[in-house]
Curated annotation (Swiss-Prot):
Lineage: Bacteria, Pseudomonadati, Thermodesulfobacteriota, Desulfovibrionia, Desulfovibrionales
GO CC annotations, alphabetized: cytosol
Keyword Acyltransferase: no
Stated name of the protein: Thymidylate kinase
Biological process according to GO: dTDP biosynthetic process; dTTP biosynthetic process; dUDP biosynthetic process
Organism from which the protein derives: Desulfovibrio desulfuricans (strain ATCC 27774 / DSM 6949 / MB)
Binding-site list for ATP: G7, I8, E9, G10, A11, G12, K13, S14
């Protein structure tokens, strides 16, 4: 099972993934936790470039192809082998981030982006996508506090420094994507306390499995 986690900055995706990993391990699974950018050795180098605020003047298409290079390597090196081995993969961001950020946020054509995503992934799509949704100002406040606490304001703050309008477009983009594919997406109210967010995510995964006559145990 391939589960992706999407949302604006500060939505709490990493926290939810960590809790769900513990939940799955308690039920005998060995989940693979990964992220974009940065899920492979190459990806970690690309992440440092893409998220650093000192990476100035990066053209939208240049940014796009760096993310796609990360994804192509990530799928080949990490995601597809894990799925073929029967493991559950929990991924912090995937193809929908490209549509939301480079499409709705940067204004690149979404159909063009879909075709590039397909090329980068070899057609691999998530089984379930959990969209952690919350107001933009709340998310940015959380992201800023997180990066300050970790000393990562410079190293990982490039997207946090985008305009409020940019992040509003990204959020609207995510919600539009969820409306287009309601069977794949579950919208999670990420403005709630972390424990409530995790419960929503867990319920969404269990509901997905019930629809397919499967269980976690």
């Amino acid at each position: 099972m391939f589960v992706t986690f999407e949302g604006i900055e500060g939505a709490g995706k990493s926290t939810a993934i960590d809790y769900l990993s513990d939940y799955l391990q308690a039920r005998g699974h060995d989940p693979v936790l990964t992220r974009e950018p940065g899920g492979s050795a190459l990806g970690r180098r690309l992440r440092a470039l893409l998220l650093d605020v000192r990476t100035g003047g990066l053209a939208s298409r240049a940014e796009l192809f760096l993310f796609l290079a990360d994804r192509a390597q990530h799928v080949t090196e990490v995601i597809r082998p894990a799925l073929e081995a029967g493991q559950v993969v929990l991924c912090d961001r995937f193809t929908d981030s490209t549509l939301a950020y480079q499409g709705y946020g940067r204004g690149l054509d979404t159909e063009y982006l879909r075709s590039l995503n397909t090329a980068a992934t070899g057609g691999l799509e998530p089984d379930l996508t959990l969209l952690l949704d919350l107001p933009v100002r709340c998310g940015l406040e959380r992201a800023g506090e997180r990066n300050r606490s970790a000393g990562m304001v410079i190293a990982e703050g490039r997207f946090d420094s985008e305009s409020l309008d940019f992040h509003e477009r990204v959020r609207r983009g995510y919600r539009a994507l969820a409306e287009e594919e309601p069977e794949r997406f579950a919208i999670i109210d990420a403005s709630q306390p972390p424990e409530d967010v995790v419960l929503q995510c867990r319920s969404a995964i269990e509901a997905y499995l019930r629809r397919r006559g499967r269980g976690l145990d």
